[in-house]
Amino acid sequence: MKRTYQPHNKRRKRTHGFLVRMRTKGGRKVLKRRRLKGRKRLAV
C-alpha cells in the first residue's frame, strides 16, 4: 500500500506558503496567532 504523504515542495508552498496565508482573512488570522505565540516560522 502506498503511503499517504508524498512530499513535493511546490505543492507544499502552494497550499501552506506565506503568500497563500496572506490571501485570505482566515490565513492572516493564522499568521497573527503564530506571531503572538512566538513561532520561529510563521509559514512553510
Curated annotation (Swiss-Prot):
GO annotation, biological process: translation
Coiled-coil blocks: none
GO terms under cellular component: ribonucleoprotein complex; ribosome
Record field: transmembrane: none
Span list, region Disordered: 25-44
Keywords, alphabetical: Ribonucleoprotein, Ribosomal protein
Highest taxon listed in the record's lineage: Bacteria
Keyword Ribonucleoprotein in annotation: yes
A Pfam family it matches: Ribosomal_L34
InterPro entries xref list: Ribosomal_bL34, Ribosomal_bL34_CS
GO terms of molecular function: structural constituent of ribosome
NCBIfam families attached to this UniProt entry: rpmH_bact (TIGR01030)
Family: Belongs to the bacterial ribosomal protein bL34 family.
Descriptive protein name: Large ribosomal subunit protein bL34
